[in-house]
């Protein structure tokens, strides 16, 4: 499932923040524990990758897969990504040019939340040494170079004795979509089913 606000126009997206999304992750983990699962794996792309790391810093996970996770983001970089998301959603919704401009202007009201999000990224990165789970760190060869650098940073900082890193040359930022997806999915399935 999407995090609250994700997949919605910017006007609705900005009603939520990183704390709402993190609460969803915690609820999902708690649900699995209450259902009796003792061996829990986690995987995530981008924001989901960050939350996979954060979860592994705070609870015992068997295996983790982290894809396209940033090790740092400037406020301007976060705002740019939100604007890019907003433009894509506005196209999907077929908003007029005026409606799109009005929608994107609301990103300015989200600056406090952007600062909080930046702080969460910094906090996650400063606690990577707490991660002991078996880990697979992945990045797309068609993504921005910063994500390859982030993958190597994360790989080098986690304390896991059993960790690996790999690029998927055909994949873009959202690695689970588009070209290279099938190979990626096979890799993840094999990783999670290893004994």
Outline where the language-model segments fall:
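Conserved alpha/beta-hydrolase
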Residues: 1-10
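Catalytic nucleophile-loop/oxyanion-hole region of alpha/beta-hydrolase
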Residues: 9-37
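Conserved alpha/beta-hydrolase fold motif
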Residues: 39-42, 64
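Gly/Ala-rich beta-loop-alpha elbow adjacent to hydrolase catalytic centers
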Residues: 44-48, 52
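Active-site signature of alpha/beta-hydrolase-fold catalytic machinery across serine-
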Residues: 54-55, 153
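The alpha/beta-hydrolase serine catalytic core
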Residues: 69-134, 141-149, 161-162, 166-167, ...
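C-terminal alpha-helix
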Residues: 187-195
């Amino acid at each position: 499932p999407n995090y609250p606000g994700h997949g919605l126009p910017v006007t609705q997206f900005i009603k939520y923040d990183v704390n709402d999304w993190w609460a969803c992750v915690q609820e999902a983990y708690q649900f699995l524990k209450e259902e009796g699962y003792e061996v829990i794996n986690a995987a995530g792309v981008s924001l989901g990758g960050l939350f996979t790391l954060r979860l592994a810093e705070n609870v015992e996970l068997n295996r983790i897969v982290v894809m396209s996770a940033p090790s740092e983001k400037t406020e301007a970089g976060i705002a740019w990504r939100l604007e890019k998301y907003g433009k894509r959603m506005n196209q999907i919704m077929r908003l007029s040019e005026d409606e799109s401009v009005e929608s994107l202007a609301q990103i300015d009201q989200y600056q406090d939340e952007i600062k909080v999000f930046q702080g969460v990224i910094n906090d996650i990165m400063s606690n990577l040494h707490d991660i002991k789970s078996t880990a697979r760190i992945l990045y797309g060869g068609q993504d921005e170079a910063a994500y390859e650098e982030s993958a190597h940073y994360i790989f080098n900082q986690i304390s896991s004795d059993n960790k690996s890193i790999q690029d998927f040359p055909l994949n873009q930022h959202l690695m689970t979509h588009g070209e290279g997806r099938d190979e990626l999915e096979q890799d993840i399935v094999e990783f999670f089913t290893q004994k």
